[in-house]
Amino acid sequence: MATASEILKQIKENDVKFVDLRFTDRRASLQHVTMDVVCVDEDMFADGVMFDGFSIGGWKAINESDMVLMPDTETVHMDPFFAQSTMVIVCDILDPVSGEAYNRDRRGTAKKAEAYLKASGIGDTVFVGREAEFFVFDDVKYKADPYNTGFKLDSTELPSNDDTDYETGNLGHRPRVKGGYFPVPPVDSAQDMRSEMLTVLSEMGVVVEKHHHEVAAAQHDTLVRNADELGIKFKMQIYKYVVHQVANAYGKTATFMPKPIFGDNGSGMHVHQSIWKGGKPTFAGDEYAGLSESCLFYIGGIIKHAKAINAFTNPSTNSYKRFVPGYEAPVLLAYSARNRSASCRIPFGSNPKAKRVEVRFPDPTANPYLAFAAMLMAGLDGIKNKIHPGKAMDKDLYDLPPKELKKIPTVCGSLRQALESLDKDRKFLTAGGVFDDDQIDAFIELKMAEVMRFEMTPHPVEYDMYYSA
């Protein structure tokens, strides 16, 4: 871990002008405050920086609004997008009275989950990798007032532009609906932009792997290595930040909404997970697909608590528009080797170090700290209570006959159902004080307000179906 004096030395050597203190709010959005370097000294690293917690939705009442941003010296990196030389430091949120971690700080929850894993004796390290898909549009317009509600998206890749007149002519090369996976340019119009994203991510300390066009028109995926422990090192937030910034630099707009377009594939965030102990993988063994019994129990915990986990892994009303059979969405709670129609997939790999579980139902609107911590707690509950996931489902689950299909449990069908499931099934989360009831209740209250707004707002489709009734 770098010391405050070492970071101050870096600031001087790199002629840094500003230090940007960042944290993640309850809705998984990045927040920041920028400090002039004249204010950055060893006292700042020891005492932190005060800020108004009341102005961050759902955190503190106005009569107790003071909170502390405590810089984490392990998270230092430079921001390549700012005009002035700026160093970024991720912060934990502390209570100024007790000096302890604030219980509603998501990053603190992830740290508690890691500590709980170590205390359990099951493992000492959890590795989490993620594949977060996204869309990039040329133009987006939306309105949500009482007398004008709707949205309009545009991208040269959209099939709706087949007959659009452009000044330079319509060149015609674009993906078809559900036909955009892996084409070369010119059908893939974003090759250079995605390469730029990976280049910037690498410069910011993220170990990158590959990128490609995804199934839907205007949909993309860039992959980074599985080297983060519960997202604590901020890699997922850096990833989303870079995607947004690079797209913006190209004159485009990126979104991690799970289902921005009806009738085409949505965006997921597949989360790869494995537990290690003493430098050895605990998920490798002699059971199904080369897994250990412990790994099967981990999967059993994920499946048992999936509906409660959905509140954290799929925390938007839009998340549940993605859960439709036929669009590669992992609706069914089953596990299988290589089978992408199962919600828990075992990627192929002969090396024991590669043995892992890929949970496919999360999406990129999730707060990574909460989502990763919740999945770990569910998996550990499965191991502790020996929850076997049952028989693997190696057939195409999308083609099962209705009678057989009804026997397989599913993810939640709405955010309301997910929040209700979380309210009823929370004991596995509060084990070891990782989550607490105040935090869970506050999260449910915050998200239920979104549900109510969504449910009470007339939808353009309702006009299409019912206006002439």
Swiss-Prot record:
It is found in: Cytoplasm. The modification O-AMP-tyrosine is found at Y398. The activity of this enzyme could be controlled by adenylation under conditions of abundant glutamine. It catalyses: L-glutamate + NH4(+) + ATP = L-glutamine + ADP + phosphate + H(+). Its EC number is 6.3.1.2. It comes from the Bacteria. GO terms for cellular component: cytoplasm; membrane. Residues 14-99 form the GS beta-grasp domain. Binds 2 Mg(2+) ions per subunit. L-glutamate binds at N265, G266, R322, E328, R340, R360. The keyword Transcription does not apply. Residues 106-469 form the GS catalytic domain. Mg(2+) 2 binds at E133, E214, D221. Mg(2+) 1 binds at E131, H270, E358. One of its GO terms (molecular function) is glutamine synthetase activity. Belongs to the glutamine synthetase family. This is Glutamine synthetase. It comes from Rhizobium leguminosarum bv. viciae. The gene is glnA.
